[in-house]
């Protein structure tokens, strides 16, 4: 049985066999660390499935783990691999009670949304254990739930110095666009940057697909890029610097009276007109500023949650 099938049947599943040439141990349900006997690279964290309906990256990660167990992929760096929200993944739902990727600043015993808060705490503990091997690279792999003018892009939660070389890293994984955000976000990648000094990214790759449909061809570059990262190989030559955007502000829904004047199905990176009314939450109103583009518009979030992100292109590259 492959690792994904095993986890869907039982959260406490173990790897069917050890990864050759490595010491492997499970440090939380759906989370393993793999320590090669011969390590030539810095630590690497790969996480997928923080949202249970984003299955393409989950299947890519599962394929890589199965290839490592079969001796086809040879890890050459300390490697943590994690499947995020197993309960939601089984039900093909984004989350059960609360968006897991908004829970990584919650105290471990926060009230409400027990499933996601508890899972965030388990993932944070696993990351802290693995971080003892030193600083490295963290990639949290997602799919988009909407159309996008840039089908694949990365979000860097803090403009930290790069260890792997951002242009080569992004290009080798088929990601031509970088969004620079703040490290205070409650996301898994921001946790890695903020608490452990990882060079951390959230990858948004392709569109949501049903589990079992298999990764789409648009994820081939991701699969190949991750394979090279795990083997500590030099990233393949890229096509120059990524296009860079920077987060300018976020609009938070404060009450159920909130109205978003951007269509809920508006594509990511849709340019806005300066002065355009964006949202209302009486008595407050928000208007677009020069050069801003929309990212992740969602009026249906719970009060107190971000409803839209506004970004602006940056001249030059990373």
Segments (PLM) and residue ranges:
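Structured catalytic-domain cores with a bias toward divalent-metal coordination
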Residues: 1-318
């Amino acid at each position: 049985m492959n690792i994904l099938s095993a986890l869907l049947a039982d959260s406490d599943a173990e790897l069917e066999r050890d990864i050759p040439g490595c010491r492997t141990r499970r440090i939380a349900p759906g989370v393993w660390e793999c320590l090669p006997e011969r390590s030539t690279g810095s630590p690497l964290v790969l996480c997928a499935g923080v949202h249970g309906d984003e299955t393409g990256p989950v299947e890519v990660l599962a394929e890589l783990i199965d290839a490592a167990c079969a001796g086809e992929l040879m890890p050459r760096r300390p490697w943590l691999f994690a499947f995020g929200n197993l309960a939601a993944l089984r039900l093909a739902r984004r989350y059960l009670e609360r968006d897991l990727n908004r829970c990584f600043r919650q105290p471990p015993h926060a009230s409400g949304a027990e499933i996601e808060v508890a899972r965030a705490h388990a993932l944070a503990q696993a990351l802290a254990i693995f971080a003892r091997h030193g600083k490295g690279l963290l990639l949290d792999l997602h799919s988009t739930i909407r159309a996008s003018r840039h089908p694949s892009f990365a979000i860097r939660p803090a403009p930290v110095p790069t260890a792997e070389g951002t242009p080569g890293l992004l290009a080798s994984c088929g990601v031509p666009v970088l969004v620079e955000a703040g490290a205070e976000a409650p996301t898994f990648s921001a946790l890695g940057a903020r608490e452990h000094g990882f060079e951390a990214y959230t990858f948004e790759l392709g569109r949501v697909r049903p589990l079992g449909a298999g990764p789409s061809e648009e994820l081939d570059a991701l699969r190949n890029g991750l394979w090279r990262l795990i083997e500590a190989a030099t990233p393949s030559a890229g096509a120059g610097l990524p296009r860079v955007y920077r987060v300018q502000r976020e609009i938070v829904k404060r009450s159920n009276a909130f109205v978003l004047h951007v269509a809920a199905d508006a594509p990511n990176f849709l340019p806005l007109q300066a002065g355009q009314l964006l949202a209302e939450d009486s008595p407050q109103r928000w208007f677009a500023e020069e050069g801003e583009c929309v990212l992740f518009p969602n009026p249906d979030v719970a009060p107190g949650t971000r409803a839209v992100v506004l970004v602006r292109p940056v001249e030059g590259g990373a």
